[in-house]
């Protein structure tokens, strides 16, 4: 029984250590929406929107492709009201860029997402005693995804862009 407890405690410790590793590496996500400045201060992403989390998806068959909205969570910032207006007016953005970066990697951009002919489909604000957050969703006609491959020395090697047309 004691041996089982020790094994369980070791496994739990590994899960805790493992789950903190990605966070400790300091990944950051930024989004560029033309004409809508954000509050990012990163030297390579000045005035971009800082993204807290993101979700995207695609479903396909041999005959059709359906892309789900790309949704982000962000803290309330100067971009918020402008994104609300873009949603209300049905404004189309030729290209929106999202970059997942990790400091210390040469060129820095690990994952590059570009959505084309994008529209804000919803924008919602929620909050508590801490800084309010906003959830913003985008529809788009096509998406290009590029995962740049890191090596053991921290250098990134160009990935192959993959483009999906969403109908």
Q: Residues of each region from the PLM?
A:
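Glycine-rich, low-complexity intrinsically disordered segments
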Residues: 21-167
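Positively charged n-region of N-terminal signal peptides that target proteins for export
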Residues: 1-4
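Bacterial N-terminal signal peptides
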Residues: 7-17
């Amino acid at each position: 029984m004691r041996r089982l407890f020790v094994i369980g405690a070791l496994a739990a410790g590994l899960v805790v250590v493992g789950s903190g590793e990605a966070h400790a590496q300091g990944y950051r996500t930024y989004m560029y929406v033309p004409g809508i400045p954000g509050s990012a201060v990163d030297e390579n992403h000045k005035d971009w929107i800082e993204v807290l989390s993101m979700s995207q998806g695609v479903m396909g068959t041999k005959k059709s492709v359906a892309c789900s909205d790309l949704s982000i969570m962000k803290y309330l910032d100067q971009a918020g009201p402008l994104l609300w207006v873009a949603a209300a007016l049905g404004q189309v953005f030729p290209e929106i860029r999202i970059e997942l970066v990790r400091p210390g990697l040469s060129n820095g951009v690990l994952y590059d997402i570009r959505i084309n002919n994008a529209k804000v489909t919803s924008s919602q604000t929620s909050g508590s005693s801490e800084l309010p957050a906003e959830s913003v969703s985008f529809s788009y006609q096509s998406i290009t995804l590029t995962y740049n491959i890191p090596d053991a020395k921290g250098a990134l090697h160009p990935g192959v862009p993959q483009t999906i047309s969403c109908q």
